[in-house]
A protein has these predicted regions:
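Conserved G/P- and acidic residue-centered "switch" motifs that form tight phosphate/ATP-binding loops
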Residues: 64
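Conserved phosphoryl-transfer catalytic core
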Residues: 164-184
Length: 357
C-alpha cells in the first residue's frame, strides 16, 4: 500500500528488528513565516533545511539569478555542477569547486532516446536531454542529492511572459493568454486529424477562459503551476532519479510561495525583482544578464535538426496511426526545432513503450 505523506508529517521507525516497524506518526505544526523575517533570512533558513542529508550534496548552477542566489548562502567548498552546451556556452561566476559537463550534438539521438524512456512520455521540453546528461555526469561523480533553483521563475515571475502580461494589467482574451504558455497552439494542433485538432485548441481556450475568471494574477499562478512548474519538476525528478539522485528545491519550501505573492515581483523592466535585488546585495561580483532559457540551442545545432527530420520522415506511417494526419514530408522539412523535438519525443516514446500501448 502506498500512502502519501502530508506536509509536516514525520514517521518514526524501530530499526532494532529484522524488519523496520512504524512506531510513531507525528504531524508537526508549521508556524507561518513571520512578517518580520526578511526574504534573506527566510531563504537562508529554507536552504539550510534542504541541505540536511547524510549524503554529499551539490548545487546545479547556471549563469542566472536563481542558482547564484542559492550559491551565495552555501559553503564555497560545496560542489557545483554546470552543463555546457556545444556552441552555446554560458559565462559563470568563478568558483573553486565547479565541474562542467559537456553536451555535444553528436550525442543527441542516443541520449534523447534514453531520456524519453526515463521520462515516460512525449514532451516539448528540450531540457529533457540536458537533465539526462546532468544526471549521468552527477551519478558518475557519486552524488545522490542536488539542490535546484526550480520554482523561482514561477513564484517570483521571471519569464518574459510575466513582463508582457503584467505591463498590460488588463486580463487578455483567452487566446492571447494561452499563447503565452503554449505558443502557436492552433497551428500545431492543425497536424492532428479533425475534429481532434479543433477540440484540442478549443479546450486550451476553455481552460484559459476559466482561469481568467479568477483574475489575471490568479490565472497566471494556475497556468504556471500546471503547465510550467509541474512538468519541470517531473522532468527533474524522473531524469535525476534514473541515476538515484534526489532533487531538492529550496524555492518551493518554507512558505516562500506565500511570501512571493505578497511582494512586488516586477519593478519597471525587471522580472523577479526581489530575488535580483537580494542577489545584488549578497554577491557583489554579480552582473545582470538577459534571461537565458534552459533549453537546447537548435538554431546552432544543425546536426540535431537533421537527425530529427530524418527520424520523423522514416516514422511518418506510425505517426499517422497516432492521429497526426497533417504531418507529411514537406511539413517535416519545414518545421522549427521546437516542434521537431516534440514530435521526435512522441515517436521515440511510441517506440520505447509501443508494446504496452
Amino acid at each position: 500500500q502506498v500512502r502519501l505523506l502530508l506536509p509536516g508529517e514525520v514517521l518514526r521507525f524501530d530499526l532494532s528488528q529484522e524488519r523496520p516497524r512504524l512506531c510513531q506518526r507525528q504531524r508537526l505544526a508549521t508556524a507561518p513565516a513571520s512578517e518580520e523575517d526578511s526574504l534573506d533570512e527566510q531563504l537562508g533558513e529554507t536552504l539550510e533545511r534542504c541541505r540536511q542529508t547524510f549524503r554529499p550534496c551539490a548545487l546545479l548552477v547556471s549563469g542566472g539569478v536563481d542558482s547564484n542566489l542559492l550559491g551565495s548562502y552555501l559553503d564555497p567548498q560545496l560542489q557545483r555542477f554546470h552543463l555546457c552546451l556545444e556552441g552555446d556556452e554560458e559565462s559563470l561566476l568563478p568558483h573553486p569547486r565547479l565541474q562542467r559537463f559537456e553536451l555535444r550534438q553528436e550525442a543527441f539521438m542516443p541520449l534523447l532516446r534514453r531520456a524519453v524512456g526515463n521520462f515516460g512520455g512525449a514532451t516539448r521540453m528540450s531540457s529533457l536531454l540536458m537533465y539526462q546528461r546532468l544526471a549521468d555526469g552527477i551519478g558518475e561523480q557519486g552524488y545522490h542529492c542536488v539542490l535546484l533553483g526550480e520554482g523561482a521563475d514561477e513564484l517570483f515571475w521571471g519569464y518574459p511572459r510575466h513582463l508582457e502580461l503584467w505591463r498590460r494589467r488588463d486580463a487578455p482574451e483567452p487566446r492571447r493568454f494561452a499563447a503565452a504558455w503554449f505558443g502557436e497552439y492552433r497551428r500545431k494542433a492543425a497536424l492532428l486529424a479533425e475534429p481532434a485538432g479543433r477540440r484540442v485548441a478549443e479546450r486550451i481556450e476553455e481552460l484559459a477562459h476559466e482561469a481568467l475568471g479568477q483574475g489575471l494574477e490568479a490565472a497566471i499562478g494556475q497556468f504556471d503551476l500546471h503547465y510550467s512548474l509541474e512538468p519541470l519538476l517531473r522532468r527533474a525528478d524522473h531524469l535525476l532519479m534514473s541515476r538515484t539522485i534526489e532533487a531538492r528545491t529550496p524555492y518551493l519550501h518554507g512558505a516562500l510561495a506565500q511570501r512571493a505573492g505578497r511582494l512586488q515581483r516586477i519593478v519597471g523592466d525587471t522580472a523577479k525583482a526581489p530575488l535580483v535585488a537580494l542577489l545584488e546585495q549578497r554577491e557583489k561580483r554579480w552582473q545582470a544578464q538577459p534571461k537565458r532559457h534552459f533549453r537546447l540551442p537548435f538554431e546552432r545545432w544543425p546536426q540535431a535538426l537533421g537527425e530529427m527530420r530524418r527520424h520523423l520522415a522514416e516514422r511518418l506511417p506510425a505517426l499517422h496511426d497516432l492521429g497526426l494526419e497533417g504531418l507529411d514530408a514537406p511539413s517535416v522539412a519545414a518545421l522549427p526545432g521546437d516542434q521537431l523535438f516534440t514530435l521526435t519525443t512522441l515517436s521515440l516514446w511510441q517506440q520505447e513503450y509501443g508494446a504496452s500501448l
